[in-house]
Amino acid sequence: MQTLKAKYNEQVRPALMQQFGYSSIMAVPRIEKIVINEGLGSSKDDSKAIDKAAKELALITLQKPVITKAKKSISNFKLRQGMPVGVKVTLRGERMYVFLEKLINIGLPRIRDFRGINPNSFDGRGNYNLGIKEQLIFPEITYDMVDKVRGMDITIVTTAKTDEEARALLQAMGLPFRK
């Protein structure tokens, strides 16, 4: 089976070039990066929860996550400036394609009642946002490892100028959009 990067170069790029009539191969949209963010919400007071979330995200993405900190103090949320509020990873290059392949072929099919991803989650600039409710859909995370089920936000940043181009790119890459 060919990798996602090879599929992009050999099949997706020429198809998009023909579909949208690009004059240069460099004008064809490509995936720039994937950002995975896991906000911890109520467990922000527990430092072990942050370490656990970082460890799980590192297992899933094969890259050490960055701990995100609060920018401002908000008294209603009992939040102080500089307190850790989540973890995030930015994937580029080969790791990005490996993660996307894992998400498409293993992760998404394991979601309960999965009928495809929402086609309306584009941001108007060619980027796609996807929310996942539990980290158990990835094979690296076993049920015994999980102390609390956490979700994550996945942002796929593309070089596409419009949502239509980005959707064509992601659909050609194999993301299963809902009809």
From Swiss-Prot:
Family matches, as Pfam families: Ribosomal_L5, Ribosomal_L5_C
GO biological process, one term: translation
Keyword field: Ribonucleoprotein, Ribosomal protein, RNA-binding, rRNA-binding, tRNA-binding
Transmembrane domains' residue ranges: none
UniProt-listed InterPro entries: Ribosomal_uL5 (IPR002132), Ribosomal_uL5_bac-type (IPR020930), Ribosomal_uL5_C (IPR031309), Ribosomal_uL5_dom_sf (IPR022803), Ribosomal_uL5_N (IPR031310)
SUPFAM superfamilies hit by this protein: RL5-like (SSF55282)
Superkingdom, taxonomy of origin: Bacteria
Molecular function GO terms recorded: rRNA binding; structural constituent of ribosome; tRNA binding
Entry GO terms, CC: ribonucleoprotein complex; ribosome
Quaternary structure (record): Part of the 50S ribosomal subunit; part of the 5S rRNA/L5/L18/L25 subcomplex. Contacts the 5S rRNA and the P site tRNA. Forms a bridge to the 30S subunit in the 70S ribosome.
Family: Belongs to the universal ribosomal protein uL5 family.
Classification via HAMAP family: Ribosomal_uL5_B
Its biological purpose: This is one of the proteins that bind and probably mediate the attachment of the 5S RNA into the large ribosomal subunit, where it forms part of the central protuberance. In the 70S ribosome it contacts protein S13 of the 30S subunit (bridge B1b), connecting the 2 subunits; this bridge is implicated in subunit movement. Contacts the P site tRNA; the 5S rRNA and some of its associated proteins might help stabilize positioning of ribosome-bound tRNAs.
Protein name from the UniProt record: Large ribosomal subunit protein uL5
Source species: Deinococcus geothermalis (strain DSM 11300 / CIP 105573 / AG-3a)
